[in-house]
């Protein structure tokens, strides 16, 4: 099977701190539904910056900064799309960028 990088963008944090557990439970259930296909559940990420080819730095991560990542195994890009469809981030208004990770 191939490896796919899921890069999460956007999404809204829970409106109330009490809702955090429900959000984390939803992520746990989604990862659980994929079983061994989850190679690395990843992490949320903090503020980012971009290094340009001239060496200059731009804060803010560009037009669509990443909010987290995971590494998933799937049989094809279509299978990766199906796996991504259950992600709780999508219900929170976020998006998922999917790219095949090439073995070197």
Residue ranges of predicted features:
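Conserved, structured core segments of small domains
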Residues: 1-104
